[in-house]
Amino acid sequence: MKRIILSRKGFDSKAGGTASPIFSDGKLVSIPIPQASPSPKKYKDLDFDGITGTQLLKEVSAKVSPNDYCHNDPLLNESIGIFGQAGSAQTELKNRGVGPGDLFLFFGWFKNFSNNGNDIHHLFGWLQIEKILEGTSKIKKYLKEKNIEHPHGYGDTSRFTNNAIYVAKNNLEVLGQKFKAKGHGLFKQTHQKLVLTEENRSRSRWKLPSRYFKNSDSLFLNRMKWQNKNACTIFYKGFGQEFILDVETNPSVKKWALGIIKKHG
């Protein structure tokens, strides 16, 4: 594992227009963004351990209709974990050396609507890469063989330039050591250890655990940077999707990621 990618997914201010929900019992579900063209799923078709897509939209008072198509990606609650990427974001991942063994940590905008909670950035899932399939023909062939429907291999995919999917390992693995934790999955309950946002700050103000991040060296490989390195705070700017961390030279950050997966995954 040389790279950890903090990957922003789910409803945002432009796509969906509201946060994904944290329910009163602590469950959280990332709502996929809308997709204008036909995709494998409409919102009414979604089911996250008994919580339907229609319930999700109602919980957050979304303007999206249950009959609208959604971009249901990444797939983290299925037997095979898959994440699709394309365009400039995929180019960035490739150019920064993201490959097999590396780990995506997915985060998004969440809020507990039942108690008018704060807007926060919260981790909701992970995927460790087993292999990368590039090009629509390879993607469609693989998905057909596995009987999987995924937006990046469904119907007309011409809008996905530089199309790729990342397939998950069966189990989490580091330096040949396999763990009991799956190679992909969801954090299904909220926990402070999964919150990126600094307490009582706007969601764009992050504070990462100094125990793991304080002495990091040249950690950020693309647009992310420290606001205060000693305090491990970040002012999250812009709408980039993929934030790539060098954990080959910062192994303590790897310990942080593995720890939260093993404890909360």
Region locations from a protein language model:
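Short, flexible loop/turn elements at secondary-structure junctions
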Residues: 8-13, 80, 87, 108-110, ...
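Conserved hydrophobic/aromatic beta-strand scaffold that supports enzyme active sites
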Residues: 6, 103, 124-126
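Short N-terminal edge-element motif at the start of the domain
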Residues: 51-120
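Contiguous surface segments at macromolecular interaction interfaces
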Residues: 1-50, 132-265
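Short, compositionally biased
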Residues: 114-136
